[in-house]
Swiss-Prot record:
Its EC number is 5.4.99.25. The keyword RNA-binding applies. It comes from Archaeoglobus fulgidus (strain ATCC 49558 / DSM 4304 / JCM 9628 / NBRC 100126 / VC-16). Belongs to the pseudouridine synthase Pus10 family. It catalyses: uridine(54) in tRNA = pseudouridine(54) in tRNA; uridine(55) in tRNA = pseudouridine(55) in tRNA. PROSITE patterns: THUMP (PS51165). It comes from the Archaea. Keywords: Isomerase, RNA-binding, tRNA processing. GO terms for biological process: tRNA pseudouridine synthesis. Disulfide bonds: none annotated. Residues 1-118 form the THUMP domain. This is tRNA pseudouridine synthase Pus10. Pfam families: Pus10_C, Pus10_THUMP_arc.
Amino acid sequence: MNLCRECYGIIGEGVVAEKCEACCNAFDRVEEFAEEIVKKMSEYEFETFNVGSRVWGSLKALQEYLSLKGIEYEIKQRFNTKLARAIEEKTGSKRTLNPDITVLFDLETFTFELQIRPVFIYGRYLKRVRNISQTRWLCGYCNGEGCEVCNFTGKKYVSSVEELIAMPAVRLFKARDAKLHGAGREDVDARMLGTGRPFVLEVIEPRKRFVDLKELEEAINSQKWVAVRDLEYTDAEKVREVKTERHRKTYRAKVVFEEKVERERLIEALESLKGEIRQRTPMRVSHRRADRVRVRRLYDARLIHHTGRVAVVEFEAEAGLYIKELVSGDNGRTRPSLAEKVGVNARVDRLDVIAVS
């Protein structure tokens, strides 16, 4: 078998020749490949990189054939090392694990692709208006295609917290897209006030990595509907932390009763409501949540204002407690409920989240 010097050194038999029947002269073309790769990499800001390669087709078949003869033809590691060294020399960047850019080289077709590590940004957001969703919500009738129901927007709601935060980030980072990971979510018709809700923004395929986050914060906050604060760079692990941590939340609800309720009776009901709450999946979300009973704690319930049939109440609760159903009882699916304790039908007219601790 005619082999280049690299493959001859790996296989240990054959003839050193100009044309390699094993790697098709991939080793001899490393500098050429590196030039092409570095040209593409220059479109992105990066400090670190890594190289991986794929073996399949005829090269894989050759490996299997040589293996039957007791010869281990491991080309990937040696090729990756040579290509990485060439890229290091041309860019001054370092090869590391968890890099900004990963080069995936196909040793069968001599093509490559770049995998760009996302940028992760932690912060807190405030939602100043009602009736926008936390994340993009496609129209259920056309699945995002656009129809008369959604006025050909493809969306159920006019906008979302995710879009209003992502759009400035995509522009500044010159990214393909951005995705919001929130610490829970408020109802579409609820505001998120106070110090805001923790979130991580995942910026996908950014061409710029080192954006001044103060500039990003100002760009987002120039809009009327959403604001952010305390932005800082983080990593992918923060997404898991934000999504799994059990945050205690405080809500302010405007409650409307079917008939007048005495103030003392209402205060007593709120006091007795504290403690363990058993909630079967609310009817309003049963189409997208598993139907089961969840046990959550209500830590505090305070009367802020009361006039006849209307009250303003603050609830401090464990994450996952549905406040609207805590008030109404949801036809007995939530027990105890404020309506049950007072003995009068009740509903939440307006709801704000005022703290996520």
